[in-house]
């Protein structure tokens, strides 16, 4: 078994509550899991 901690930055469309956009992104994010950038990696350094 493996535990994975993932962080996503979500920008909801106008009129969409952030928690709904986040839930949709997590669901759909597994299809496009490797959307990663150096900027996002640097932002996650604080969690190490």
UniProtKB/Swiss-Prot annotation:
It comes from the Eukaryota. The keyword Chloroplast applies. Keywords: Calvin cycle, Carbon dioxide fixation, Chloroplast, Lyase, Monooxygenase, Oxidoreductase, Photorespiration, Photosynthesis, Plastid, Stress response. Coiled coil: none annotated. It is found in: Plastid, Chloroplast. One of its GO terms (molecular function) is monooxygenase activity. Its EC number is 4.1.1.39. RuBisCO catalyzes two reactions: the carboxylation of D-ribulose 1,5-bisphosphate, the primary event in carbon dioxide fixation, as well as the oxidative fragmentation of the pentose substrate in the photorespiration process. Both reactions occur simultaneously and in competition at the same active site. Heterohexadecamer of 8 large chains and 8 small chains. Belongs to the RuBisCO large chain family. Type I subfamily. This is Ribulose bisphosphate carboxylase large chain. The lineage of its organism: Eukaryota, Viridiplantae, Streptophyta, Embryophyta, Tracheophyta. The gene is rbcL.
